[in-house]
Amino acid sequence: MRLVFAGTPEFARIALDALLAAGHDVPLVLTQPDRPAGRGLKLTPSPVKQAALAAGIGVAQPRSLRLDGRYPDEAAAARAQLERVAPDVMVVAAYGLILPQWTLDLPRLGCLNIHASLLPRWRGAAPIQRAIEAGDAETGVTIMQMDAGLDTGDMLLERAVPIGAQQTAAQLHDELALAGGQAIVDALAALGQGGLAPRRQPDAGVTYAAKLDKAEAALDCSLPAAVLARRVRAFNPVPGATIRLPGLDDPVKVWRAQALEQAAGGPPGAVLRADAQGIDIATGQGVLRLLELQKAGGKRQPVDVFVRGWQP
């Protein structure tokens, strides 16, 4: 099947690799423009661009696909490239640009999106993190036929993935990326044989995964310890949960923590104990034990190392 692939981060790169390994013809990739990255803020191509160039695939990087937007010349050039390629399908995974109607209409079989949740739960920008934050027992990937709405298109295929009790967003991301790559390969195989029946998303159970905000990183110790422990996992690695500890001017990043089902024994935010086993923080309900931390400008440290250089 002749495909155009639109995606940007590592999640999308894994799907592109799966499509190429399955033998699909991918003559063109759309991805976000190169961005500054690293300490030197050097312009760096996206993971998808790097994979495409390594495979000898053409790459387009328009800043917008809207013909009436801020970059109409770039959008028109991308449209001309797509029309020359004449794809059967466009596969979209974490691309980062809104697809206008002309884009949805151009491929013979439309545009298919790999979404990292079991729709209609967690439509939107951060489904992996919000599923962990909410305490969901499972999530998954959905292959859907794209329409003009925000993740509202008909579903073609779903794959459920359990969420581990200590699983971080980084770990779940990697698992869902692999599941998404296999799911889109399976969906295209079934689509080619006429074996996929689109299903309308149910009206019940719709939730939205709001984009992550750096302000959310600061742990509010008035909340229950269980909520805070989930946020630590959900925000690992980005934006990274932080907490303020006595004696330190800057917030400390929390990489691992656990909720203890015991009375707080102090006002929210109070340090109840600090030793090699953990730093216990009183919360609005229960105790949050900090297990791995990182000072500003420092390295990640297990708590037994961290407490040697810090005392409340």
Curated annotation (Swiss-Prot):
PANTHER family: METHIONYL-TRNA FORMYLTRANSFERASE (PTHR11138), METHIONYL-TRNA FORMYLTRANSFERASE, MITOCHONDRIAL (PTHR11138:SF5). PROSITE patterns: GART. CDD domains: FMT_core_Met-tRNA-FMT_N, Met_tRNA_FMT_C. InterPro entries: Fmt, Formyl_trans_C, Formyl_trans_C_sf, Formyl_transf_N, Formyl_transf_N_sf, Formyl_transferase-like_C_sf, GART_AS, Met-tRNA-FMT_C. Disulfide bonds: none annotated. Keywords: Protein biosynthesis, Transferase. This is Methionyl-tRNA formyltransferase. Its EC number is 2.1.2.9. Attaches a formyl group to the free amino group of methionyl-tRNA(fMet). The formyl group appears to play a dual role in the initiator identity of N-formylmethionyl-tRNA by promoting its recognition by IF2 and preventing the misappropriation of this tRNA by the elongation apparatus. It catalyses: L-methionyl-tRNA(fMet) + (6R)-10-formyltetrahydrofolate = N-formyl-L-methionyl-tRNA(fMet) + (6S)-5,6,7,8-tetrahydrofolate + H(+). GO terms for cellular component: cytosol. It comes from Bordetella parapertussis (strain 12822 / ATCC BAA-587 / NCTC 13253). SUPFAM superfamilies: FMT C-terminal domain-like, Formyltransferase. It comes from the Bacteria. The keyword ATP-binding does not apply. Belongs to the Fmt family. (6S)-5,6,7,8-tetrahydrofolate binds at residues 117-120. GO terms for molecular function: methionyl-tRNA formyltransferase activity. It is an enzyme of class 2 (transferase).
